């Protein structure tokens, strides 16, 4: 189980420039992540995704995010996300714990 507070710090430092998490939050360079868990790739309403993201067809959850966040461009070739990934499994676990909580509120 990840540490939500550590995950929040990771999000703030590495993700918050491009993403929001709150319900009704604006899309930035990347989509708002509210409702992420259980949603198919490329489905946030009002955000312009690449065909690669739309066509990946997986459902976001702990396992898919764990793999994606390690190396986004390897997991979804053609994604426009510029983030190179979190190599530390602990950091990914903490970030996922935060995202699970923050995107469900």
Curated annotation (Swiss-Prot):
Tell me where in this chain the PTM N-acetylglycine is found. 2
* GO MF: electron transfer activity; heme binding; metal ion binding
Cellular-component GO terms for this entry: mitochondrial intermembrane space
Residues binding heme c? 15, 18-19, 81
User: Any keyword Electron transport?
Assistant: yes
Location, primary (coarse class): mitochondrion
What keywords does the record list, in alphabetical order?
Acetylation, Electron transport, Heme, Iron, Metal-binding, Mitochondrion, Respiratory chain, Transport
Name which cysteines form disulfide bonds: none
**PROSITE patterns named in the record:** CYTC
Q: Does the keyword Endoplasmic reticulum apply?
A: no
Mention any Pfam family matching this sequence. Cytochrom_C
Q: Which InterPro entries match?
A: Cyt_c-like_dom (IPR009056), Cyt_c-like_dom_sf (IPR036909), Cyt_c_1A/1B (IPR002327)
Q: Which family does it belong to?
A: Belongs to the cytochrome c family.
- PANTHER family recorded: CYTOCHROME C
Function, as annotated: Electron carrier protein. The oxidized form of the cytochrome c heme group can accept an electron from the heme group of the cytochrome c1 subunit of cytochrome reductase. Cytochrome c then transfers this electron to the cytochrome oxidase complex, the final protein carrier in the mitochondrial electron-transport chain.
- Its recorded name reads Cytochrome c
Taxonomy of origin reads: Eukaryota, Metazoa, Chordata, Craniata, Vertebrata
